[in-house]
Curated annotation (Swiss-Prot):
Belongs to the ethylene receptor family. The modification 4-aspartylphosphate is found at residue 657. The modification Phosphohistidine is found at residue 353. One of its GO terms (biological process) is response to molecule of bacterial origin. Activation probably requires a transfer of a phosphate group between a His in the transmitter domain and an Asp of the receiver domain. One of its GO terms (cellular component) is endoplasmic reticulum membrane. It comes from Brassica oleracea. Pfam families: ETR1_N (PF25487), GAF (PF01590), HATPase_c (PF02518), HisKA (PF00512), Response_reg (PF00072). It catalyses: ATP + protein L-histidine = ADP + protein N-phospho-L-histidine. Residues 609-726 form the Response regulatory domain. Residues 158-307 form the GAF domain. Gene3D superfamilies: 1.10.287.130, 3.30.450.40, 3.40.50.2300, Histidine kinase-like ATPase, C-terminal domain. This is Ethylene receptor 1.
Length: 735
């Protein structure tokens, strides 16, 4: 019996339903297959999708679902076992993948639900970042304004310009209606309206500094909002205004300038502040923002620094101007002093010349009178005249020396000399006076004292003569000792003087001790003051001028030394000590100025022909008298031309007066040299001058004169000069 596997439709609508199922499964399969393709496409387009492996599972699930619907198309009709097997396999796989996907969704769905939370978080974070960016932009804008304002403020160091610039730039930057600066008064008890933005010349309006609103602002470094009706904020008209703009105030520190006194600057014994008031426009809803207040605070600090710099510069410029004025005054005073010194020197030079000419006559004639037969009374008068004249000549020399020491024109004349001989010569000059006063003098020379040294022999001798002479002058009894030694580093000396000997130099120490009148210790500093007279010394009664020690001190200073006096009091004697710097000489014999013969009185001048040229008739007569008394045959002339005409080889010596200014009298020496080409035929040329300055001696040497003789000249001086001429030696008397 044949079995039929065909399913016969039980009713006609079944076929229609089958067709609908067939079509539905087809479209379901198409949809299932298209969904993974769409997912794959969009996932590839997105680089941030985090669940790719989940998408693979979900895609497999959809594909398998679509496959079951597609396979199901073949099950609506009679189908083979293979189709049933495929259908079963597809459904099993679909079930497995569906379960796996369902299990995976348990973990995925919470993450998907948290996406909204993350979205809200990101939105909040973005809003916060926007706020921070706005703050950064605000700070950057504030910083830019601060830099701009600081540059404008620092572009000048004028105090008024700084303040006006600050107000203008703040008003422009912050769009202010008004801006003002209140400065403390000199007393610091009030604030005065000094600068405003809208008014070029504000009314001098003051408010007490103790107002509560001012104390509130001065109590903090921050900008403070104050009432628009505050006394310091009433700077704008209020008529027609419905709403006054907000007002802030900030303090401006006035830095303490301890080393300066600034005009119009308050006394800063306590910390003081200025007050800056800033006003927003009226009838507006604008308010102060935090960054604007910070800008105001920073600008206030910058203004404080700029004001301090300006104040310092202002005072420095004032000090500079004052210093320039003082320099001008000092320069004028210096020029006046130099003019006065030149006038004094010119006066002294003229007086020296004018006084030495009559002094020459007095001393020369007095010395001639001494050689004649005189009664004791006459001889005493002549000796008194001669002694007084010599004292006057010494005083003139001292005044000239002091003048040249003070203006710095006197320089040391260095040369090699015998130091031991110098001390013996000083004693030979002083002993006659000491013998009369019955004062024994002893000389102690240290064994290590160099014999030949380099220094200014004349000035050193002058110092020693002054000090030893004072010891003899002010001692009525006792003894005098003169000690010379080489100063050692450990020798006692004043605290401000240090001896530093070297291999080529040493310091000579001379100590002159006497048992005379002594000195009051309070009077010792006065001894080195020119023209000073101490009652303990009774200088005037002793015939002194008060110049000796003052000149000696200056000479010692020129020799890089020091001088001081020690005494225990009146009646106990005193000790004068000085150190001078000398150079050590390697010469075995002195090459300095030759000395006159020991006994010039024994030289015979009879028949010695001498020519005297002097424009002054009295001086010419006196010089002739001295020479005639010595036995010379004298010819006198009164002019250079006459001298040049008369001079001949028979004349052994020509005395020429060169006291007149100019070089005419020096030129005659050159013409005499030209006239006598052979030296042994030319007479020796000796200058007669009353000028003691070094330039006269140098000029005489440069014009070929053989010697210089200073007026006034005594008979002994003339005898010594002529004896030296006969020895054929060039003589330049120490000047």
């Amino acid at each position: 019996m044949e079995v039929c596997n065909c399913i016969e439709p039980q009713w006609p609508a079944d076929e229609l339903l089958m067709k609908y199922q067939y079509i539905s499964d087809f479209f379901i399969a198409v949809a299932y297959f298209s969904i993974p393709l769409e997912l794959i496409y969009f996932v590839k387009k997105s680089a941030v999708f985090p669940y790719r492996w989940v998408l693979v599972q979900f895609g497999a699930f959809i594909v398998l679902c679509g496959a079951t619907h597609l396979i199901n198309l073949w099950t609506f009709t009679t189908h083979s076992r293979t189709v049933a097997l495929v259908m079963t396999t597809a459904k099993v796989l679909t079930a497995v993948v569906s379960c796996a996907t369902a299990l995976m969704l348990v973990h995925i769905i919470p993450d998907l639900l948290s996406v909204k939370t993350r979205e809200l978080f990101l939105k909040n974070k973005a809003a916060e970042l926007d706020r921070e960016m706005g703050l950064i932009r605000t700070q950057e804008e504030t910083g830019r304004h601060v830099r701009m304002l600081t540059h404008e403020i620092r572009s000048t160091l004028d105090r008024h310009t700084i303040l006006k610039t600050t107000l203008v730039e703040l008003g422009r930057t912050l769009a202010l209606e008004e801006c003002a600066l209140w400065m403390p008064t000199r007393t610091g008890l009030e604030l005065q309206l000094s600068y405003t933005l809208r008014q070029q010349h504000p009314v001098e309006y003051t408010v007490p500094i103790q107002l509560p609103v001012i104390n509130q602002v001065f109590g903090t470094s921050r900008a403070v909002k104050i009432s628009p009706n505050s006394p310091v904020a009433r700077l704008r008209p209020v008529s027609g205004k419905y709403l006054l703009g907000e007002v802030v105030a900030v303090r401006v520190p006035l830095l303490h300038l301890s080393n300066f006194q600034i005009n119009d600057w308050p006394e800063l014994s306590t910390k003081r502040y200025a007050l800056m008031v800033l006003m927003l426009p009226s009838d507006s809803a604008r308010q102060w923002h935090v960054h604007e207040l910070e800008l105001v605070e920073v600008v206030a600090d910058q203004v404080a620094v700029a004001l301090s710099h300006a104040a310092i510069l202002e005072e420095s410029m004032r000090a500079r101007d004052l210093l320039m004025e003082q320099n001008v005054a000092l320069d004028i005073a210096r020029r006046e002093a130099e003019t006065a010194i030149r006038a004094r020197n010119d006066f002294l030079a003229v007086m020296n010349h004018e006084m030495r000419t009559p002094m020459h006559a007095i001393i020369a004639l007095s010395s001639l009178l001494q050689e004649t037969e005189l009664t004791p009374e006459q001889r005493l008068m002549v000796e008194t005249v001669l002694k007084s004249s010599s004292l006057l000549a010494t005083l003139m020399n001292d005044v000239l020396d002091l003048s040249r020491l003070e203006d710095g024109s006197l320089q040391l004349e260095l040369g090699t000399f015998n130091l031991h001989t110098l001390f013996r010569e000083v004693l030979n000059l002083i002993k006659p006076i000491a013998v009369v006063k019955k004062l024994p003098i002893t000389l102690n020379l240290a064994p290590d004292l160099p014999e030949f040294v380099v220094g200014d022999e004349k000035r050193l001798m002058q110092i020693i003569l002054n000090i030893v002479g004072n010891a003899v002058k002010f001692s009525k009894q006792g003894s005098i000792s003169v000690t010379a030694l080489v100063t050692k580093s450990d020798n006692r000396a004043p605290p401000d003087f240090f001896v530093v000997p070297t291999g080529s130099h040493f310091y000579l120490r001379v100590k002159v001790k006497d048992l005379g009148a002594g000195i009051n210790p309070q009077d010792i500093p006065k001894l080195f003051t020119k023209f000073a007279q101490t009652q303990s010394l009774a200088t005037r009664s002793s015939g002194g001028s008060g110049l000796g020690l003052a000149i000696s001190k200056r000479f010692v200073n020129l020799m890089e030394g020091n001088i001081w006096i020690e005494s225990e009091g009146v009646g106990k004697g005193c000790t004068a000590i000085f150190d001078v710097k000398l150079a050590i000489s390697n010469e075995s014999k002195q090459s300095g100025i030759p000395k006159v013969p020991a006994n010039p009185q024994h030289v015979n001048f009879a028949g010695l022909k001498v020519l005297v040229m002097d424009e002054n008739g009295v001086s010419r007569m006196v010089t002739k008298g001295l020479l005639v008394h010595l036995g010379c045959e004298v010819t006198t002339v009164s002019s250079n031309e006459e001298c040049l005409r008369v001079v001949s080889h028979e004349h052994r010596v020509v005395f020429m007066d060169v006291c007149t200014p100019g070089v005419e009298n020096y030129q005659i020496a050159l013409r005499i040299h030209e006239k006598f080409t052979k030296r042994h035929q030319r007479p020796l040329l000796v200058a007669l001058t009353g000028n003691t300055d070094k330039s006269t001696k140098e000029k005489c040497m440069s014009f070929g004169l053989d010697g210089v003789l200073l007026k006034p000249v005594s008979l002994d001086n003339m005898r010594n000069v002529l004896s030296d001429r006969l020895e054929h030696r060039v003589l330049y008397e120490a000047m």
